[in-house]
Amino acid sequence: MRRSFHRMFVRVPLLVAFVGAAVVGCGTPDARPANEAGTVTLRLGYFPNVTHAQPIIGLADGTFARELGSDVKLEAKTFNAGPSVIEALFAGAIDASYIGPNPAVAGYVQSGGKDVRIIAGATSGGALLIVKADSGITKAADFSGKRIATPQLGNTQDVAARAWLRQNGLRDRDHGGTVDVRPIANADALALFIKGELQAAWAPEPWATRLILEGNGKTFLDERDVWPGGDFVTTHLIVSAKFLAEHPDTVEKLLRAHVKTTQWINGNPDQAKQIVNAGIRQATGAALPEAVINGAWRNQKTTYDPVASSLRKSADDAFALGYLGDKKPDLSGMYALDPLNRVLKELGLKEVSK
């Protein structure tokens, strides 16, 4: 029976927040398909936005092609939404992709833990609580009776907003409180914010910066300030479990390209921003204004660490909000970090943990 990811995504919206404990490794030799060229085809998905810097840059400068080598045929595909990525992965149309945590976890759960593996992180941070400059909001208690937008019911920012309200003695109306939390698509939230119909928004980049620059907003809280070390996951690199099992050497080559590109980005931020914005323009027809990409870049961190601990904390928040039902699902096999740690060890870098 064909999976319906979109139904799953609505039914279990908060599963982004919960991550299990076990790390899955794979050590079998790379199995090459018997095609006439003797090559492996790797179909890689990504989004043309600022939180997907590694594929945009690594594809543009040839790092991915060089590290994969002549025996791997790389096909890149762009997407605009996480559910579409998971549908493509389920259908066998892609093998790996950069993606946000919510659809990755939901896909893992729907497949019964069989199809999706997180093999690296890509971006941390990049979410802020923005308030209208003239809203009169200066402290947490001032949010009582106000309207706050989040991108989607149960997504990462939605959970963070509702949990933060609880930590500050408030509750959203859905849970018997006085704060009106409204899940609204980012573009629509920006329009309503500009009109003054919203007093606040817990938003990801580049939307947070746009709320400030276009909507007379100001930062009330940078979400990094509520996480240990300021790190929480925004973007992952995932791979199909089947591809990982059949082509572990190819996955390690991809991870080597990912890590090297991450290092280059962090060492050359100004150049990296320009390349990312050029990639966004090529894919979408419009680059981000310089002030927007500069602001968004400051508020996020490019990394290969999946920051798994941040998902465990979010899981506790999601469960407390009642979004995970009476029993937390078993996500114990979702992470496959052994290949990444082998690459990190080879490059003399600190290994990441689950």
Pin down the residues of each PLM region:
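Short, solvent-exposed loop/beta-turn-alpha elements that line the ligand-binding surface or hinge
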Residues: T63-V72, D225-G230, R298-P306
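Secondary-structure end/capping motifs
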Residues: A245-D326
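Short, low-complexity disordered leader/linker segments with a strong preference
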Residues: M1-T41, L349-K354
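Conserved C-terminal helix/tail region of periplasmic/extracytoplasmic solute-binding proteins
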Residues: D316-K354
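Soluble non-cytosolic domains of exported or imported proteins
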Residues: F79-P83, P151-V159, A187, W202, ...
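Pocket-lining segment of extracytoplasmic ligand-binding domains
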Residues: S135, H175-T178, R182, D188-I280
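Short, glycine-/small- and polar/acidic-enriched structural segments
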Residues: R32-P183, Q199-E205, N216
